[in-house]
Amino acid sequence: MCGQIEFYVIFITYEHCSVVEFRIKIRRKEDAMSQPERILFAGDPHGNFKPLIAAVHQYHPQAVVLLGDYDLDMPLDVCLQEIADLTEVWWIAGNHDFETPVKYSNLFNSAYSDRNLHLKVTEIAGLRVVGLSGVFLGRVWYPPQKPKWLGKYHYLDSQLPNVLDADMPLKYKSAIWHDEFESLKNLRADILVSHEAPGSHRHGFKVIGELAHAMGVKTIFHGHLHENYIGIIKNNIKVCGVADAAVSDLQGNKLT
């Protein structure tokens, strides 16, 4: 949690010719964004976790957030065992994490399986962080085009009888589904972490910025496109692109 700053509002009244002073103590959270290294953001490692591990040793963050595309040949917790006791590890998934059953299992069945930020808001080091895993697929939904399927239930209903979500092809599991995306607009967060980019990038999607605005998000961090940059989109939302195997702080400063 952020540190607490205390200050007082003083009201003075007169009672029986005497001054009566009321002090009301007010607390507010210290601005977590003023401590940029409290959370680090790791761009697509593609099997190379050395820069992230080095950054944790150097900057001692409270938490790290990984932005997808791990290309895991062993469980994620094994790859990061050197920093397991040094910081919190959180993550979203990228398209590469659904390429094979092994890559998928090494992420979703790892000891960090409960640190998946997808489709929920989690308080991390005093900030509300919401995650959006996966990518837009033409066979599911590719904005600004209309979605091919309203949601997973719609897709599954079109398949053979008794086909369950667990049987969905990995390619479809990697997709951003329209109904899940829209449901996020009911949540509130400070930071959005996504694999896909918003409209700040030439290969980004305007709808991600619209989603961020609906949630009250002030900063977006994304991976996928292997570029470090800082930009501003509509509604004064800051966007920080984090390159492959790069690490950035809360201000978007490249640390590795």
Where is each model-derived feature located?
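N-terminal active-site segment of His-dependent metallophosphoesterases
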Residues: 7, 14-85, 99, 186-188
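Glycine/small-residue-rich loop that forms an oxyanion/phosphate-binding "nest" at active or ligand-binding sites
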Residues: 101-118
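Active-site-proximal loop/helix segment associated with metal-binding centers of metalloenzymes
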Residues: 127-195
